[in-house]
């Protein structure tokens, strides 16, 4: 394993080890993008069953983070790393382990999942999905992370060949690397959370009510995806047909070629189940109504975002969605008139559906009703990877995690049944042993 000389490399290694052991190896169907790729091969080749057993026993059943972290630190594959750490670094690594172990607590209100929203990527990107309702103003303390102050040299070298963002802290007056589970939270122009901080710890605070199954998002910055986020591909921009989706939206509605579908296209669309065809949801209709009335997205940069933090990328790099930019730039815009027609909007979403999924089969989960892509599954009533992973870990259907409550309920029912049986038994015994009345005495 490579010697880690800098504070940045040490904490980057911590995060890579934690994501490798506590996400990738815990029934996760994809692979988390690593920060520096410093993880030793012996750690990458570790068997997942021992890690899952620790999570099941000490986190899901006993909710004991300390004991779980203690058992993980005893893996012999971690010895080369632990021997090089000072006592302070060991405490920091243990604390980082607990951040990721907290993801599996029964009280945790979210789940690390994946999304195909950004179809430039060759694989699904990580995202955070709410498992329970989260009220506005509530701190999502388990969705936290650590900020690492960067030197100018580290800022120039960070993420070479990668696409990692960094935080700018006005309090620290420095660029900082953002590590921990909260780094999986994606950007949205109409975000439902904002950053909150205490010391070097950072977490998310809910700014509006979040429903179960809704993605937890935050606002990065006003110019993170180009000038005024003109290249943004978030869910809100997709529903509005603006920014990165603007060219595709206008082309879908104005191009005459789009209206004349080939028979193969029609057959492909009709072969999809009704639930898999795009139907304008009530949530999308509300977005359309806002647009029709001349409304705009909420200004998260001024109202929802903690002013201390905003996300940037190094100046020598650009965040480029290469495939989307190429696809959208190749489409000629023939008309720039406002598009307020619901039919145009439906056509835009259908075209986007085809571009995002191609000819791959799309299924609808039998449990959570979310659509997903899995070419290995033959049964259209299959469960999505999120629900399969959840069921393996908690032995309960998503989103329920409270296994302890279920066991207490079963024990209580068993106790009631036992008492009922005792009452019935004593009653029958009293009838059998009741003395006969002597009428002659």
Curated annotation (Swiss-Prot):
BP GO annotations: methylation; mitotic G2 DNA damage checkpoint signaling
Record InterPro entries: Hist-Lys_N-MTase_N, Set9_fungi, SET_dom, SET_dom_sf, Suv4-20/Set9
Major location (coarse): nucleus
Pfam families: SET
Ranges for domain SET: 108-221
EC number(s) recorded for this UniProt protein: 2.1.1.372
Location relative to the cell: Nucleus; Chromosome
Gene3D superfamilies cross-referenced by the UniProt entry: Histone-lysine N-methyltransferase (1.10.10.1700), SET domain (2.170.270.10)
GO molecular function: histone binding; histone H4K20 methyltransferase activity; histone H4K20 trimethyltransferase activity; nucleosome binding
Keywords annotated in UniProt: Chromatin regulator, Chromosome, Methyltransferase, Nucleus, S-adenosyl-L-methionine, Transferase
Record-level GO cellular component terms: cell division site; chromatin; cytosol; mitotic spindle pole body; nucleus
Entry keyword annotation includes Nucleus: yes
Reactions mediated catalytically: L-lysyl(20)-[histone H4] + 3 S-adenosyl-L-methionine = N(6),N(6),N(6)-trimethyl-L-lysyl(20)-[histone H4] + 3 S-adenosyl-L-homocysteine + 3 H(+)
Described purpose of this protein according to its UniProt entry: Histone methyltransferase that specifically trimethylates 'Lys-20' of histone H4 to form H4K20me3. H4 'Lys-20' methylation is apparently not involved in the regulation of gene expression or heterochromatin function but participates in DNA damage response by giving a 'histone mark' required for the recruitment of the checkpoint protein Crb2 to sites of DNA damage.
Family annotation (PANTHER family): HISTONE-LYSINE N-METHYLTRANSFERASE KMT5B (PTHR12977:SF4), SUPPRESSOR OF VARIEGATION 4-20-RELATED (PTHR12977)
Entry similarity comment: Belongs to the class V-like SAM-binding methyltransferase superfamily. Histone-lysine methyltransferase family. Suvar4-20 subfamily.
Name of this chain's protein: Histone-lysine N-methyltransferase set9
Lineage summary: Eukaryota, Fungi, Dikarya, Ascomycota, Taphrinomycotina
């Amino acid at each position: 394993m490579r010697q880690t000389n800098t504070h940045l490399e040490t904490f980057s290694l911590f995060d890579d080890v934690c994501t490798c052991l506590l996400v990738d190896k815990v029934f996760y169907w994809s692979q988390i993008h690593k920060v520096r790729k410093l993880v030793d091969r012996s750690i990458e080749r570790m068997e997942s069953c021992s890690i899952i057993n620790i999570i099941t026993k000490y986190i899901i059943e006993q909710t004991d983070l300390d004991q779980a972290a203690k058992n993980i630190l005893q893996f012999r594959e971690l010895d080369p790393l632990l021997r090089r750490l000072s006592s302070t670094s060991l405490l920091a690594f243990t604390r980082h382990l607990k951040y990721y172990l907290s993801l599996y607590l029964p009280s945790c209100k979210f789940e690390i999942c994946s999304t195909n929203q950004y179809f430039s990527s060759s694989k699904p990107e990580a995202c955070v999905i709410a498992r329970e309702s989260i009220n506005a103003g509530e701190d999502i303390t388990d969705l936290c992370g650590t900020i690492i102050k960067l030197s100018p040299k580290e800022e120039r070298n960070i993420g070479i060949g990668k696409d990692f963002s960094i935080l700018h802290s006005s309090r620290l007056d420095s660029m900082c690397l953002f590590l921990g589970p909260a780094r999986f939270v994606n950007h949205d122009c109409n975000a439902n959370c904002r950053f909150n901080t205490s010391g070097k710890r950072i977490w998310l605070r809910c700014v509006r009510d979040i429903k179960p199954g809704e993605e937890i998002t935050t606002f990065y910055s006003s110019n993170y995806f180009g000038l005024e986020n003109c290249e943004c591909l978030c869910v809100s921009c997709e529903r509005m047909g603006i920014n990165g989706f603007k060219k595709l939206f206008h082309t879908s509605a104005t191009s005459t070629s789009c209206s004349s579908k080939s028979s193969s296209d029609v057959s492909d669309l009709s072969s999809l189940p009704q639930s898999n065809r795009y139907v304008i949801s009530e949530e999308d209709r509300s977005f359309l109504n806002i647009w029709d009335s001349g409304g705009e997205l909420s200004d998260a940069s001024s109202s929802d975002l903690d002013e201390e933090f905003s996300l940037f990328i190094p100046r020598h790099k650009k965040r480029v969605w290469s495939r989307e930019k190429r696809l959208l730039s190749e489409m000629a815009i023939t008309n720039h008139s406002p598009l307020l027609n619901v039919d145009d909007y439906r056509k835009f979403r259908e075209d986007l559906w085809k571009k995002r999924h191609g000819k791959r089969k799309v299924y609808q989960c039998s449990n959570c009703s979310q659509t997903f892509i899995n070419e290995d599954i033959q049964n259209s009533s299959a469960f999505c990877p999120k629900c399969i992973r959840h069921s393996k870990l908690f032995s309960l259907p998503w989103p329920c995690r409270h296994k302890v409550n279920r066991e207490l309920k079963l024990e209580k029912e068993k106790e009631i049944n036992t008492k009922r049986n005792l009452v019935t038994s004593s009653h029958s015994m009293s009838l059998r042993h009741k003395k006969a009345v002597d009428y002659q005495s």
